[in-house]
Regions:
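Short, low-complexity, polar/charged sequence segments that are solvent-exposed and flexible
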Residues: 47-52, 63, 71, 82-83, ...
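Post-signal-peptide N-terminal segment of Sec-exported extracytoplasmic proteins
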Residues: 37-67
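Sec-dependent signal peptide recognition
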Residues: 1-7
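Mature extracytoplasmic domains of secretory-pathway proteins
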Residues: 60-89
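C-terminal motif of bacterial Sec signal peptides marking the signal peptidase cleavage site
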Residues: 14-16
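Short, well-ordered, aromatic-rich surface patches in folded extracellular/luminal domains
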Residues: 5, 18-34, 74-76, 87-141
Length: 141
């Protein structure tokens, strides 16, 4: 009887923790922007939807994400240490001489904002590269 109750308790706690993580992601907002004199791209992902703006005077296009794409984004997001985001450094510095647009990743989780310093669009810091590339892919669709 003890083993059965212990097993049920373990399953209950495990299920509770996984549903908590899922609800955390529904309130998390990821925003990627790339800006230069002639370029403006903004991608906002939140709660299985993506909003893409390609141009300063254009309306955003909002679409729903497939479950597979959402799980891919959540998997990459979970690998990131949010506290280290403000200290990340891009591998190149082309943005200083107009060689690349300025890229920026901003994450809002539990009403706290985590934002990278500017980096070259197309050359994100290695720690966030896969997530940024997933977000940039939405501007190509």
């Amino acid at each position: 009887m003890r083993i059965l109750s212990l097993l049920l308790l373990t399953i209950f706690i495990g299920t509770s923790c996984s549903s908590q993580k899922t609800s955390d992601m529904t309130s998390t907002q990821m925003e990627y922007s790339a800006v230069s004199r002639g370029l403006y791209k903004l991608v906002i992902v939140q709660n299985k939807t993506v909003s893409v703006t390609n141009g300063k005077n254009t309306q955003p296009v909002v679409t729903n994400l497939s479950d597979a794409k959402w799980k891919e984004i959540v998997a990459e997001f979970s690998k990131i240490n949010l506290e280290s985001i403000p200290t990340l450094k891009g591998p190149t510095e082309k943005r200083f001489y107009d060689g690349a647009a300025i890229g920026n990743l901003k994450i809002v989780k539990n009403q706290k904002i985590y934002e990278t310093p500017g980096f070259d669009n197309g050359y994100p810091p290695k720690e966030i590269e896969k997530l940024v590339n997933l977000l940039v892919d939405f501007t190509k669709e």
